[in-house]
């Protein structure tokens, strides 16, 4: 058999000066979006001035500069301040989450399962329904209890996301098989069946999450 000719490598154009700046912007953007960086802003409620100071510190480190003050004079007080902020935020956030669950539990349209999942089926969809081992395509929006959207297919061109139901948070594994193709469900997930004590990225630790999910397709 004749040898197959490999496809030509794609031609990558050199970046313009403006695009080079955008490339480094993206490097910084994705660095901060890593979970350990995103949690700084989430847990500490940084003001604009504090964000600016944080960026100044990063800029100095990138340029191999040294602080213009004695770090040892600041570090003990900084650790105390950060600890107090984290504890205060956790207490306030816990109260918000409890109040949200109480509101949901007072809504007779929601049902509750043994795991603590609260759900309301908006549209049941058609049979057959997926199983907990199925791979599905869904449209969805996820919010924290303060109404902030932390993830949504609407921000990605409204293209359905594909994933195996045994590879997502337990709340999804339990809830999505309740609907069929074309179905919609509103689910409220306590932290124990969501992202737990650690949180993830913009999601604070011990967060109750609200999802609206539409099942577009059962892939397999």
Which residues does each PLM region occupy?
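Cross-family detector of peptidyl-prolyl cis-trans isomerase
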Residues: 1-220
């Amino acid at each position: 058999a004749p040898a197959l000719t490999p496809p030509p490598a794609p031609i990558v154009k050199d970046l313009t000066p403006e695009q080079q700046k955008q490339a480094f912007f993206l490097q910084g953007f994705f660095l901060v979006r890593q979970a350990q960086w995103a949690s700084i802003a989430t847990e500490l409620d940084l003001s604009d001035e504090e964000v600016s100071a944080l960026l100044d510190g990063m800029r100095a480190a990138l340029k191999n500069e040294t602080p213009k003050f004695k770090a040892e004079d600041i570090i003990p007080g900084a650790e105390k301040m950060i600890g107090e902020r984290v504890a205060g935020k956790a207490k306030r956030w816990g109260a918000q989450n409890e109040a949200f669950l109480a509101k949901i539990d007072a809504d007779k349209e929601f049902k509750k399962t043994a795991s603590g999942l609260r759900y309301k089926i908006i549209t049941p969809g058609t049979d057959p329904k997926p199983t907990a081992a199925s791979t599905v395509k869904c449209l969805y929006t996820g919010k924290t209890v303060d109404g902030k959207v932390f993830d949504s297919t609407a921000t990605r061109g409204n293209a359905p996301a594909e994933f195996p139901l045994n590879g997502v948070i337990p709340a999804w594994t339990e809830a999505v098989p309740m609907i069929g193709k074309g179905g919609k469900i509103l689910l409220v997930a306590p932290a124990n069946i969501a992202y737990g004590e650690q949180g993830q990225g913009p999601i604070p630790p011990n967060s109750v999450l609200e999802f609206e999910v539409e099942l577009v397709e059962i892939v397999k």
